[in-house]
Amino acid sequence: MQSEGCNGLLRVVYSREDESHLKSKEKEWVAIMEWMYRSTRNAANRVTASQAILQGLAEDGGLYVPEQIPALDLPLATLGEMNYHEVAYAVLSRFLTDYTEEELKYCIRSAYDRKFDTEEIVPIRKADGSFYLELFHGATIAFKDMALSILPYLMTTAAKKNHEDKEIVILTATSGDTGKAALAGFADVPGTRIIVFYPKDGVSAVQEKQMVTQKGKNTCVIGIRGNFDDAQSGVKRIFGDEALRKELSEAGFCFSSANSINIGRLVPQIVYYVYAYGRLLAKGELQAGEEMNVVVPTGNFGNILAAFYAKQMGIPVGKLICASNENKVLYDFFQTGVYDRNRAFHLTTSPSMDILISSNLERLIYRLSGEDAKKNAELMQQLTGTGRYEITDEMRAKLQDFAGGYATEAETAEEIRTLYEKTGYVLDTHTAVASYVYRKWKEQNHPTAPVVIASTASPFKFARSVMSAIDAKYAGMEDFALIDELSRIANVPVPKAVEEIRNAPVLHDKVIETGEMSDAVKSFLGISK
């Protein structure tokens, strides 16, 4: 074995003589010493992976990003032989370098276990020529389970590593799915409390009931009179309130986040795109080195950013297709280079995408700017001040990896109905947006590469919208009657996550104005105003 220095990092290269000491799936290992993270708004703000996960959001308001994207450095062909746990370790160990092998494998084992209803964790279903990456087999039947099942373990391990003795307060804004997944992940986890804010009239009936029936002595769920952007902006203001941060610290608390602004949410999402490539290899749908295209229904930009990071690691991804609903601020950005949230806000049947401020786009903007923290901070200040910013032509030229499209409400419903009638496969509303966008993009571009469409939620989570799309006759039925009928026509059992809330009592009924969020946090923590 020999070591090669590279930009201050240690690259470990194994010779053939060393191969006998390694499992075949772990050859070509790259060990990185002190892989650091820095804020997108201040390059001098550098922390370790575990510190970034603990903090959630940088104190300067920026998001933590790795100083470099590590190469996967595994022969692509081996991915077809690896299970989800093995792929997760291969990815996480390259990003979270201050965690030991034992710590990471403990987190992975604890996260991806019987909470998922299939040993495969993430099945891939082929329908009408497309591969649907089913990310909804976890405890709350949405893709957020993929990262939020492991985040509590990463965070509590990080607290021990950094000798953090304060109680961690998880603040989360949700457009529907993150909230329940975070609550399920952190409920009754020692040393933590979790507060979730959601738009009272901006989530589905099932999403709301999943949250307001959540058990756990350390959980708090609060509806706000406003939309998701109001909730997310309110959480960011709380994070940036130095006086409140000091008050909490003196009371024995520290803030962190379960939103995808936390790098501990984002990195685990990279795993399933790497895994998807391996599954297509195993199925013989492509050969090692051949590309796959990826389509992601997109709101806060974290899920598609994870696919972009997978590509940067070396996974052969062709186009990254960003699918929007009628809140098409991202589609317009990719078309024009102008990000402008000054527009009407639409409540749609794909509520997890009803977002006009896509927080994770900042991580991409930072990369497009050549990792110029000052330039990025200026653009984000413009967004805060005027609601818009425009990137340079040089930055736009770096967006060639991406394509964009959007679906109206009518087009989304038609996609659900058409695919069901053609194949019997039922999509949720968000995945239907992605499926429609890809179908239109395919008609114009005639791709030869296979496509992976991120299927982000179970149709049972949006049964009313799904069933109404399939046939208008279902419009008058009660919510759980619709769920039972969906189970019948799709020939799929009602998920446990839905059965559990059928008769569950409401435990959280507080609704507030956005200006009352800080006081609500202090009240839950027992701190006087």
Where do the PLM segments sit?
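PLP-dependent amino-acid enzyme catalytic core
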Residues: G8, V12-R16, H21-K529
